[in-house]
Amino acid sequence: IISYVRPDGTLVARKFEAWSNQGAYASHGHSIVAKGMGAFPQLYPCDNLECDCWTVYTNRPAAGAMRGYGIPQAMWAGECHIDDICQAIGMEPMEFRRKNLMPVGYTDGFSRNELYADTFNQCMDKGMAMLDYQRKYREYQNQTGPVRRGVGLAVFWYNTAVWPISLESSSCRMVLNQDGSLQFQTGETEIGQGCDTAYSQMVADAVGIPVEDVHVVSTQDTDVTPFGTGAYASRQTYIGGFSIMQTALALRERILQIAHEQTRMPVSVLDLVDGKIIRKEDGR
């Protein structure tokens, strides 16, 4: 990382280079390093920016994503670099961060991610108060000797999925059982992060049945399960949730349509609540 900074802490230009170990076979290396590259300029926007990244084949096992998808590496290097800048220009690190962090309403030109709320400053205020940061920062200046104390904070920015670097897609199948319960299949597989629970809650809320009546098979059979691109990049609930919600709403409409055919009551006056089809006007 190379940064050109004015004495008042204004970022003038930045350059970022990164390499990703791909291993001996093609895997997620390209999108992992690209995610880090994409996150780097968004945290501290700068008008003049150059980012280059490379995927490198090595004589090692195939490399892939595991908890972070390229962004933690870029954030670690970037935040260490920010502290080096502050030391070089004699500026308090948190003051520099507040000056340069992306403002509310900022939209990144590459990913189209937008910052909707002032959460960065809120988190920094809370963290600094809990650490008693200002007092410790002043107290720990100008130390000598082999053992010294220090205090610091870093800012982390992360987003889900890999769009626009790679394709994002998800699909879902739902089956209504004879007892009124429901089972669904999705290619976005549970690997311990709790997405099946989130999915079940989405289905229950969208269809209008108790969550106890929603069943999902965590170990999916790829022969019969709709296609999903995988469990990576913190994408499960966000990307998989869209296909699940659309399928659940379509199933709900189909159930109400059948109720209309049986009762001749318009679908517009019917509702599905807690597993029961009712009239909206009186709940009966």
Predicted regions located by residue number:
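Beta-strand segments within the central parallel beta-sheet cores of soluble alpha/beta enzyme folds
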Residues: 12-17, 46, 93-102, 138-155, ...
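Alpha-helical support elements that line or immediately flank enzyme active sites
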Residues: 31-41, 65-100, 122, 126, ...
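Helix-loop-helix junctions that connect adjacent transmembrane helices in secondary transporters/permeases
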Residues: 100-181
